[in-house]
Amino acid sequence: MWSLPASEGESATAHFFLGAGDEGLGTRGLGMRPEESDSELLEDEEDEVPPEPQIIVGICAMTKKSKSKPMTQILERLCRFDYLTVIILGEDVILNEPVENWPSCHCLISFHSKGFPLDKAVAYSKLRNPFLINDLAMQYYIQDRREVYRILQEEGIDLPRYAVLNRDPARPEECNLIEGEDQVEVNGAVFPKPFVEKPVSAEDHNVYIYYPSSAGGGSQRLFRKIGSRSSVYSPESSVRKTGSYIYEEFMPTDGTDVKVYTVGPDYAHAEARKSPALDGKVERDSEGKEIRYPVMLTAMEKLVARKVCVAFKQTVCGFDLLRANGHSFVCDVNGFSFVKNSMKYYDDCAKILGNTIMRELAPQFQIPWSIPMEAEDIPIVPTTSGTMMELRCVIAIIRHGDRTPKQKMKMEVTHPRFFSLFEKHGGYKTGKLKLKRPEQLQEVLDITRLLLAELEKEPGGEIEEKTGKLEQLKSVLEMYGHFSGINRKVQLTYYPHGVKASNEGQDTQREALAPSLLLVLKWGGELTPAGRVQAEELGRAFRCMYPGGQGDYAGFPGCGLLRLHSTFRHDLKIYASDEGRVQMTAAAFAKGLLALEGELTPILVQMVKSANMNGLLDSDGDSLSSCQHRVKARLHHILQQDAPFGPEDYNQLAPTGSTSLLSSMAVIQNPVKVCDQVFDLIENLTHQIRERMQDPKSVDLQLYHSETLELMLQRWSKLERDFRQKSGRYDISKIPDIYDCVKYDVQHNGSLGLQGTAELLRLSKALADVVIPQEYGISREEKLEIAVGFCLPLLRKILLDLQRTHEDESVNKLHPLYSRGVLSPGRHVRTRLYFTSESHVHSLLSVFRYGGLLDETKDTQWQRALAYLSAISELNYMTQIVIMLYEDNTRDPLSEERFHVELHFSPGVKGVEEEGSAPTGCGFRPASSENEERKADQGSVEDLCPGKASDEPDRALQTSPLPSEGPGLPKRSPLIRNRKAGSMEVLSETSSSRPGGHRLFSSSRPPTEMKQSGLGSQCTGLFSTTVLGGSSSAPNLQDYARSQGKKLPPASLKHRDELLFVPAVKRFSVSFAKHPTNGFEGCSMVPTIYPLETLHNALSLRQVSEFLSRVCQRHTEAQAQASAALFDSMHSNQASDSPFSPPRTLHSPTLQLQQRSEKPPWYSSGPSSTVSSAGPSSPTAVDGNCPFGFSDQPSVSSHVTEEYQGLGLLQEAPGSGAQEPPLEGQQEPFEQNQSPQEPPVETKKPCQEVAEEVSQPCQDIPEEVNQPCQQVSDICQPCEENHDDVDQTCQEVPQISQPCEDASQLYQKVSKEVCELCQNSEEVNQPCQGVPVEIGRLVHGFPVGVGGLAQEVLGEVGRPTQEIPEELSQSCQEFSVDIGRLAQEASAINLLSPDTPEVDNPPLEFPGEGALQAQEVSEWVKQQQSYVVPELIDQLSREEVPQVQCPPSNANPQSQSLAPDQNAPLPPATCDSSFSH
């Protein structure tokens, strides 16, 4: 209710009354004094008071705007000020009356919209000279995007890199457009796709986003919302040819936009909404309004809001922010706009406007300057009842979905045209070249056609043999009539002395001395429609692992994740390797996970990050390790013996005793005989296909995924030729391809009815089940060595993901005021999804199986898990390894019981073998309830026994019976904690009374959505139903049953144990999908996916961290020993001018300053074939031919070193120092005094892993910062080349108010801090002690492009490393505190000013190796800034934080050796974290 007017004594100041809602607002007319319509009770008092002079506030806008709900709400509140009277100029007056006749006013709120005569408003303001809330002259500029961008640039506000194309006949020099296949060049500036095309008029909302051909091409066309759509996907890929446009870099925002609404320079309200570019569907609530979520702005973003407000002189102003790679860019300024449907905003806005007007026009009242208290200052953190555990992190490694068979052909080429092609695309720099883009493949096709034409004229002996391969090359490249860029690639490798003669019957005596190229053509391997469906379904099922929301978000299970994601409390990053099928799987998964609609291309570009630059998820299949070569040779030798397997063969081939391996060998018995049978069956198959092709009925027959009989015949004929060599021996490496092909045809082309395919499948599967897993190592030691070689970067990344459990200040947070009824609104669930190929999944599983995670002799649960894994014969498509991290907030933060890890696994899609042969696991079983009063009939894991299953025969229709060791399950270990709070945010009252506390959704998924997916099982299949007792993380079975159209008998809910045996999850149902995409005669099968099985649910974070660290350390030590001899020889042979100098003697010429690049600093040099310039972010292994070296970078290194200690990853390595960058194409050997533990391979990795966390050390520095230090050379470049994440350090920095004469003292301060922090490191248990990081490399581990920076500001660069104490070991938790101190070094920011110049980009062929770790590391640092994040103080106090002090203004004398010039004084950094005005 509104308050009554103030008494006479109080009327000396203007008053503002806060309202509770809409009720009661309509009783008072606008423009009326508050007293005129108040109760008569106060009439007598009013009669005694003479009438007060009024300040008249005029509203001059179109009726649609001035009578809108937000405006009405705000004006009603504005009228509550005693001295303000509001008048609204009618539209008729504005349009038709001369300005002289307009009513006069003291204050004018006027803004432009469609049809508004801005000229008349300007004339009126000149005539009456009112106080303008929003400047009118600036509104002309806001209507032109070119002017908006110009002003933003002048104000130093970050915006995407852009160029303007003016199609103006008077200025032809501004209209230079060159359009390519995957880029445009605008007036000399090149924009690779994806890029954005915006009309220059701000009133034109037809913005187009163009996608690269590698992602599927086409464009997304955005427009003003029409009904439920805000954009539509179009296959058109060429830009518009009429009109003037702004072209700008596409910002990968993970599918969300932030809209900011300012009211004056000190108040900003922000809301997040789904990006219209994602799928174009507008999410609306029950009242039909677009769903938006209020989010909290970071300190940097508040500073941006202030700058925008002041620069455009618009008190009330809306603008759009893009949060990309942890940094914020302004992409649009809309001028006057209000928040819709936020009572708090209406209250705040009216109060600020009223106060602003009164202070300006009635200064005698001396109204204090106060802005409404920010909601984030109110610590609303509801506690949970009981000891619930909270889901904090989900890490999943997932293999791609069902694909077409992969095919490969190799040929040696020596024609000069191939060499010139190789040279043209820069192949000589690395000796290798990968061609995937359509124009590149077209060049290869042109050369092939030319050579074939020449061969027809001059047929020759040896050339005849090549003719067949050239024909095949031509036919594959011509296959679809166009190049999609995803399904074919050509690789060329340079051999200076010719390709070595292979063992396939070629003349080994011929000695080839002339240089040649090995051409490898790869095709096939595309994701099938079935694969897309599998990925989307798995994404949908994955939702059910996350906390549930209060009420149903969209009326179907899994709503918890959607609510979590929409409110920005879900920190999701999806990574995919280089391959198209992997990227499309990731996009389809994201589509299901986040309930998106439409095409995969926009989802792929915005949601999927590319991790292809550094081996995180890719592996160079052409360069096998020596261990792999040995293993393959031994495998081939054993399988070439024409005799039954004997005991010795079993020992040689299956030393691990794997159950699946032994059973496959039992099927094979004599490998050569089985290969003979397989070869005969393939011959028979090709014969049948040829016959079928002669049949007139089959002429136009279309097989699955648009394949023809001719293409199918090509596929099998090639295998027939290659499998049996000229010598009569069999090429064992073709067995996986044969199995691949026959599995594909049985599943997708079964309607052809070809004879013998079932037997071929049985035999080839038996062979493949031996060959495929054994290619990754035969003995345990080999398996582990090969596994770590494949996935060392991924292991380190997982280690980082697990250890970064603290909160991040700048991650998008839901406004606490709007999160009542939400469990711990300030917390986040971090999800990291890694989509990759078979090799990484095999390798990662080998690490867990053979790396010594647990002692199986002492841990029966792990013993059972290993037995289950041993029985798995194939890691099929969509195999998942899932790691879930829980936190128990009731435990001491440093105790081992604080964090709890679970390991789950699924072997992927159901194979084509009989269902009964599937191995059974122990079910999906997160740690179950520890309720003391639990009864046996509550279905706890320990009390399940096979007997119960037989009591319910009609409901126990599971394909996998309960494990026989059911009664022998171990009693609960102390680590199996209480039921996870992660399972639901808020338990409804009804659910808590039900046995087991399962939350039942009020309704299942609407039938419309089921129809869209075309599948019967909606969320099914993620979890094994063998055991679900006590698992509130598991999805609700009743919902599954409902989605299957089944009815649970009422009795089934009486006891939880009975619920376990309901056949709600059809584990292996095969959908004969009536999907239009599902291929041949609608009968293609989409197999369901095996549910997740729990391998272990009682691990501590410390156990897992130490295990991963140990594995990584063992590998690096082994590599170091192997490369020590190599280093010695290389070092002794160095010439005096060798690029490899000993540490501490580095002197290289000063780097010349370059002009600032047009690319934003986060811009990496471009993914090779992925779409997502969305910054990759992951650690890297240094390629042998890596063009980047590790130059000295002291300024950033101090940050990095601190971050590393905080992560617990920094270990002492003796004698570390600075290295000079290696020459291009050379690998960097060890320095003499380097630790033998550190191999060259992983040198850059630590640096990159940290780069993510370094992103925003300076985010919350006070805003009175105006003069950046201009003398520092190129620090922005590391971001541009390699770290999307360091981009924040370059850009998000407020500018310092006093110019910094010399940056040298900053180095002193930072190194002093490093020294102090290092010296404080006491003995603390280290969860990550196994990751040795050579400090010299860490400190100087930035790319070559930054090398000269050291010389600009530093005389001697080797020093920072020397100052680091020897015993450097610090645990994650204890060190997390000290980052705050660094954050307060405001001076540190000067070095990272946006105005600093940059060095040139590296060539495009070398995408930034270090680029990948960007976004996530920043998250960890931000939360360490304790003075900005009040909710962290509690946590930090438990860790005995030293009091944070302002740094002294004088330089530390101990660090003077770092700076060449000690004379320039450095102003003290301010520690005041508030904005001052």
From Swiss-Prot:
Bias kind Polar residues: ranges: 1001-1016, 1446-1460
Region (Disordered): 27-47, 910-1016, 1131-1248, 1438-1477
Cleavable signal peptide: none
Modified residues (Phosphoserine): S940, S983, S1033, S1069, S1141, S1148
Annotated region described as Polyphosphoinositide-binding domain, given as residue ranges: 382-453
Principal cellular location given in the protein's record: cytoplasm
Binding site for ATP: 145, 198, 205, 224, 248-251, 257-259, 275, 320, 332-334
GO annotation terms (biological process): inositol metabolic process; inositol phosphate biosynthetic process
GO CC terms, sorted: cytosol; plasma membrane
Keyword ATP-binding: yes
CDD domains named among the record's database cross-references: HP_HAP_like
Catalyzed chemical reaction(s): 1D-myo-inositol hexakisphosphate + ATP = 1-diphospho-1D-myo-inositol 2,3,4,5,6-pentakisphosphate + ADP; 5-diphospho-1D-myo-inositol 1,2,3,4,6-pentakisphosphate + ATP + H(+) = 1,5-bis(diphospho)-1D-myo-inositol 2,3,4,6-tetrakisphosphate + ADP
Keyword Disulfide bond: no
Binding site for substrate: K64, K65, R224, K225, K259, R273, S337, F338, V339, K340
Residue stretches of biased makeup (Acidic residues): 37-47
Protein name, per record: Inositol hexakisphosphate and diphosphoinositol-pentakisphosphate kinase 1
Organism: Bos taurus (Bovine)
Gene: PPIP5K1
